[in-house]
Amino acid sequence: MKEDTNISEETIREGFARTTWAGRFEVKRGLDRTFIFDGAHNAAGAESFAMTYNELFKDTPKTVVMAILKDKDQEAIIREVIKSGDTVLAVPAPTDRTEVPENLVEVIRRTVPKVTAQTAESVEAALALAYKHTKTGDIIAVCGSLYILGDARQWFFHEMSH
């Protein structure tokens, strides 16, 4: 690749600063809430989510819509993403590899103390419930599986357009 010496380092830095990657700590503000869409589907991704969340939001409790696949290190993901005081809505991912939401709730309760966890039948139902039970300024995160991000983002943009 040919180097273009006419592009300043500042321009390159600005370009990187403005770059977004859908589903990688994608922050959307709307519906009077802050929504975070992040795959966080393995231990490293969950650790990255936790580091970024802590930098931006400190210890602010959040509502998490979560699915995790059976073959993932569920406890490692949960330990990083979920903190005491959080509320979690476990949902199925649209794959036969998904963990059953009821089982996921058990793992969450066993792994993180003082967490509220329940199931929802779908990502859309969980987001509607999360929205209903949160208030202006609250944080709703969707993570644990890349499989659920498309439906979550679609729900968000649909609700924003109405």
Q: Across the structure, where does each feature detected by a protein language model lie?
A:
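Nucleotide phosphate-binding/pyrophosphate-handling subdomain across enzymes
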Residues: 1-87
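Active-site-proximal loop/hinge segments that shape catalytic or ion-binding/gating pockets
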Residues: 145
